């Protein structure tokens, strides 16, 4: 950031140094000799004559362009001098008493131009060569005879322009082409004829100027509003044709130089202040990083996460690393209630997802470090791995694995993406159930997720589902899991929230089971949890209860792919949905029971294998006695395998299996 600012500063100074001479030497080449600006001021002083005011203003600019075309064959000045001429004309008119409101209303610089471009024609030669212009030249031959000669000229010009640029052209283009036509005709005639033609084209009068006004007249004092020789006089507007002796330009050159230099110095001071402030912020951030690292438990910076065949170090990132990896936080890939997620590419090649926490409480660094210490020890193939964290003043950042295929929500509901197959959906359902089983049964103390939804289920490059945002339960000082008091706001997403939790505000693992059931129903139907303003669970009740209507629940995009075997699997999965979404938590199965039934529905061999393993270990035999699987159309669960111990501030789920991960 500092290097970029310094480079920008040097480039700015170099640009100003190269542009300063051109700014000081800039001059408008248009000749306004004999232009009666006093007449313009008189006409424009009457607000009822706005149209006439604009015609006079336009006429004087057009005759000056015609004179310039006589010398250069160009219909106006070059682009780099256009703004200079407009500014000079505006100042000159103000010197004669024409108000800024008048020049603004008439569009000096936007409608009244000093550079004519008529459908790509910018020179006298191009206009003469355009089709139909010869007819205009013949009808506008001067001097005009008494009668309808002017009208004949105008009608010829109108016909020419309509054929040239079309009848539907906007007014600005039409006016520009009219001015270009006049300038082309007037560029090859004398001043008297040019003024006569001007009166016809713009319907203006009183333009006759005494011949002596065209001779050089010395101005006794510098005028504050001269343009190419324009200076107010006591009798009439008279102009000197020699710009080299114009005192106005001699006084403007140092003025412009002083202004540009002052602006450059001001910008230099501002940039120096900004650079010093940024340096100070970065120094403070690095100092804070060093300080907070001392408060992090010693196990955190060197904690290793071993998952399958990969390993990576959990570490603390500096704020500078965060800003560089996210391009100053300009790589947003997602946003939710708990923070904004950015894609980050670190210098060591690590590609990660960085979550900036939205709601940061007045939480001590040690408390935050203890919580991320808890999260860092959660490692499972179906949980998004936490790679590290960052603390910057009151800002908190969490660094996770980057999931290439986005969220389940994107694949189910995004327009233009192919829908996941039935097999892929069931695989995702089992992956999520595995993650929840780990949180509920294999952590010590057990954890609840609290916000299971399709957008929190991420997919890696192989479409392995991983649960994210599982850090919503906080660790207390004694190591137990803490939740907010009863009067806290309800957390979760509409459509996924356990209705029992909404009433009691007491969180249990059965709340996760309910949310999982909604996700499972979302996988079956391909519809959102709240669809068309209605709750998906309530909307699906009549299909859940009748086996004959199970197939009607299926996403229409994949319904044809479900065969007889898939139909039996569908019946089992629908039964799981119905049981998971029971209104009372005690009527719902545990996630372990859900996982077993899903695995059996996908692979019948799994049932015998699971039974053999359980008999071998022995610890789960009492749970199986509580699970009643009836033959027929549906499976009914008995009492849950886990009893919930409820507390406002802490809770733990009993029956954590032996060899469960402890921290």
From Swiss-Prot:
PANTHER family: OS01G0750732 PROTEIN (PTHR47989), PROTEIN KINASE DOMAIN-CONTAINING PROTEIN (PTHR47989:SF36)
Ranges of Low complexity composition bias in the record: 640-652
CDD domains the record matches: STKc_IRAK
Cytoplasmic-facing ranges: 276-663
Membrane topology: Single-pass type I membrane protein
Binding site for ATP: 333-341, 355
Species annotation: Arabidopsis thaliana (Mouse-ear cress)
Record topology, Extracellular segments: 26-254
Entries under PROSITE patterns matching the protein: PROTEIN_KINASE_ATP (PS00107), PROTEIN_KINASE_DOM (PS50011), PROTEIN_KINASE_ST (PS00108)
Catalysed reactions listed for this entry: L-seryl-[protein] + ATP = O-phospho-L-seryl-[protein] + ADP + H(+); L-threonyl-[protein] + ATP = O-phospho-L-threonyl-[protein] + ADP + H(+)
Record key words, sorted: ATP-binding, Cell membrane, Glycoprotein, Kinase, Membrane, Nucleotide-binding, Serine/threonine-protein kinase, Signal, Transferase, Transmembrane, Transmembrane helix
Residue stretches spanning the membrane: 255-275
Subcellular location: Cell membrane
The keyword Membrane is annotated on this UniProt entry: yes
SMART domains in the cross-refs: S_TKc (SM00220)
Enzyme class name: transferase
Protein family (similarity comment): Belongs to the protein kinase superfamily. Ser/Thr protein kinase family.
Protein name as annotated: Probable receptor-like protein kinase At1g49730
Active site: 451
Ranges where the record places region Disordered: 213-243, 631-663
Organism ancestry: Eukaryota, Viridiplantae, Streptophyta, Embryophyta, Tracheophyta
EC number: 2.7.11.1
A single Gene Ontology CC term: plasma membrane
């Amino acid at each position: 950031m500092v290097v970029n600012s310094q480079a920008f500063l040097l480039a700015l100074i170099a640009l100003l140094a190269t542009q300063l001479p051109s700014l000081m030497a800039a001059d408008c080449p248009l000749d306004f000799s004999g232009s009666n600006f006093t007449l313009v001021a008189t006409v424009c002083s009457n607000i009822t004559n706005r149209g006439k005011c604009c015609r006079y203003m336009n006429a004087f600019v057009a005759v000056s362009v015609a004179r310039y075309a006589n010398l250069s064959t160009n219909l106006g000045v070059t682009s780099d001098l256009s703004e200079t001429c407009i500014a000079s004309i505006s100042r000159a008119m103000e010197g004669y008493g024409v108000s800024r409101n008048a020049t603004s209303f008439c569009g000096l610089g936007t409608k009244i131009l000093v550079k004519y471009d008529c459908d790509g024609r910018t020179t006298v030669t191009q206009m003469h060569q355009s089709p139909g212009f010869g007819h205009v030249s013949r009808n506008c031959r001067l001097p005009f005879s008494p009668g309808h000669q002017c009208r004949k000229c105008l009608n010829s010009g109108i016909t020419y322009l309509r054929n040239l640029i079309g009848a539907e052209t906007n007014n600005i283009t039409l006016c520009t082409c009219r001015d270009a036509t006049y300038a082309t005709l007037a560029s090859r005639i004398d001043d008297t004829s040019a003024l006569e033609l001007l009166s016809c084209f713009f319907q203006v009068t009183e333009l006759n100027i005494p011949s002596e006004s065209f001779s050089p007249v010395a101005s006794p004092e510098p005028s504050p509003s001269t343009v190419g020789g324009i200076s107010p006089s006591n009798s009439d507007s008279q102009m000197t044709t020699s710009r080299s002796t114009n005192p106005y330009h001699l006084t403007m050159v140092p003025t412009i130089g002083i202004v540009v230099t002052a602006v450059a110095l001001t910008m230099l001071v501002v940039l120096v202040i900004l650079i010093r402030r940024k340096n100070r912020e970065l120094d403070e951030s690095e100092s804070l990083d060093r300080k907070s690292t001392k408060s992090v438990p010693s196990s955190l910076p060197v904690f290793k996460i071993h998952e399958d065949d990969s390993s990576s170090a959990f570490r603390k990132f500096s704020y500078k690393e965060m800003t560089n990896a996210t391009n100053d936080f300009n790589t947003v890939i997602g946003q939710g209630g708990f923070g904004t997620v950015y894609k980050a590419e670190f210098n060591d090649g690590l590609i990660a997802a960085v979550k900036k926490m939205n709601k940061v409480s007045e939480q001590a660094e040690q408390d935050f470090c203890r919580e991320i210490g808890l999260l860092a020890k959660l490692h499972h193939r179906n949980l998004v791995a936490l790679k590290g964290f960052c603390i910057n003043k009151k800002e908190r950042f969490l660094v996770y694995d980057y999931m290439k295929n986005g969220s389940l929500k994107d694949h189910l509901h995004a327009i233009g993406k192919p829908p996941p197959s039935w097999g892929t959906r069931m695989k995702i359902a089992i992956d999520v159930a595995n993650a929840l089983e780990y949180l509920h049964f294999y952590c010590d103390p057990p954890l609840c997720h609290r916000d299971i939804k399709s957008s929190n289920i991420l997919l890696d490059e192989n479409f392995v589902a991983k649960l994210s945002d599982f850090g919503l339960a906080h660790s207390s000082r004694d190591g137990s899991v803490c939740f907010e008091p009863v009067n806290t706001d309800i957390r979760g997403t509409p459509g996924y929230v356990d209705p029992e939790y909404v009433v009691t505000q007491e969180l249990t693992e059965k709340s996760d089971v309910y949310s999982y059931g909604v996700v499972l129903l979302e996988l079956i139907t391909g519809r959102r949890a709240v669809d068309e303003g209605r709750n998906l669970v309530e909307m699906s009740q009549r299909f859940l209860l009748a086996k004959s209507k199970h197939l009607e629940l299926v996403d229409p995009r994949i319904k044809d792919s479900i065969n007889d075997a898939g139909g039996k699997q569908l019946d089992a999965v629908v039964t799981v949905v119905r049981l998971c979404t029971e209104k009372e938590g005690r009527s719902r199965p545990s996630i372990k029971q859900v996982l077993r039934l899903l695995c059996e529905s996908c692979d019948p061999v799994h049932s015998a294998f699971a039974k053999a393993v359980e008999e071998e270990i022995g610890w789960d035999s009492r749970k199986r006695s509580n699970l009643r699987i009836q033959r027929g159309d549906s499976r009914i669960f008995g009492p849950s395998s886990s009893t919930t111990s409820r507390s406002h501030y802490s809770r733990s789920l009993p029956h954590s299996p032996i060899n469960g991960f402890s921290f």
